[in-house]
């Protein structure tokens, strides 16, 4: 601002506005000197601060350390002040009975030159000596409030988020689909989708058409994912529940236990198969011998033949035996005063040698081929293994596991059926056990 040293000087108080280090605008009443200067051929009143320099902000007057003040023009005898936009700016009281005022924004003219018009009427001004520490904390609070109000206003302008619709993500619907399919066991896509649509529409009522399409699409995607990880299976339109994958340790223990159980069952079935093959071979050997004897004209007497099946009781000659029979002859009760042995017909046939050494693993190659002709073709390898004594686990291994397993079942069923068939017909007397007198004496005392 241009000013001259000449002119009238008058000491008075004037309103000073300054901007602090935080960018806030404040005003205060300060002793000043008024000088009349000539500018553009017209007298202009120029105000200068007393006790502080108008050109620096680091004075010791207590104002410079808060903000920078400057020289401002006065037009007439009335005190003028700067009008700036700073709503809600206030200055605290410093003396008893003093007041403060709020400065509102007004349009000014000549802001670049420092000349201001339109005096503000009816305002009361504060006369105080500012405390730098209190002023700094107060200005910090004002700035914080200003920033908070700015952020609040900006957030209010932002677009409001709509609440979550029923169309949620794939993870959500995968869980829902899992629960539905597990609950039903067997279901279809339409049934699962209809149930989920009704549930979601009941909880969330928005755009029904849009949400239904979204839910059905999510259900379709979830079913494909679950089918890919083998949780469910799909056969045409029918969806079946398989189950969620379990923990690897639990799965390993369960498989290990199942493996042991199956191996034990296989072992038992192998023993059953071996016993059935032995019975089959013994019966075939008996039939062949009877045919050979009949062809030679040897016909046993009724006392020398025993009908199958039978049980032989073996004990000492001095043993006292008490035998009682029920009226329907379905039960026989024996009482012995000494030890005794009981043998069924199969055991007797084994002792008579009709197995040709097959049970002991001492069968000759000729007898092995002979026995193979008595059994079904799929059991021939078992006969060879029993005859040679090679009855390890390797005999049950095969390149074609499915065919081997099926052959195993068929052989077991055929052998069991043959045993039942033989037992049924031997009761009618079709098969006869012919024993020599020497053999009877050896087995029955």
Swiss-Prot record:
It is found in: Nucleus. Keywords: Activator, DNA-binding, Nucleus, Phosphoprotein, Repressor, Transcription, Transcription regulation. The modification Phosphoserine is found at residue 398. It comes from the Eukaryota. Residues 145-156 have a biased composition (Low complexity). Residues 412-426 have a biased composition (Polar residues). Residues 158-168 have a biased composition (Basic residues). One of its GO terms (molecular function) is DNA binding. Its main location: nucleus. One of its GO terms (cellular component) is nucleus. Pfam families: DP, E2F_TDP. Heterodimer of E2f and Dp. Cooperate to give sequence-specific DNA binding and optimal trans-activation. Component of the DREAM complex at least composed of Myb, Caf1-55, mip40, mip120, mip130, E2f2, Dp, Rbf, Rbf2, lin-52, HDAC1/Rpd3 and l(3)mbt. Component of the DREAM complex, a multiprotein complex that can both act as a transcription activator or repressor depending on the context. In follicle cells, the complex plays a central role in the site-specific DNA replication at the chorion loci. During development, the complex represses transcription of developmentally controlled E2F target genes. Can stimulate E2F-dependent transcription. Belongs to the E2F/DP family. This is Transcription factor Dp. The lineage of its organism: Eukaryota, Metazoa, Ecdysozoa, Arthropoda, Hexapoda.
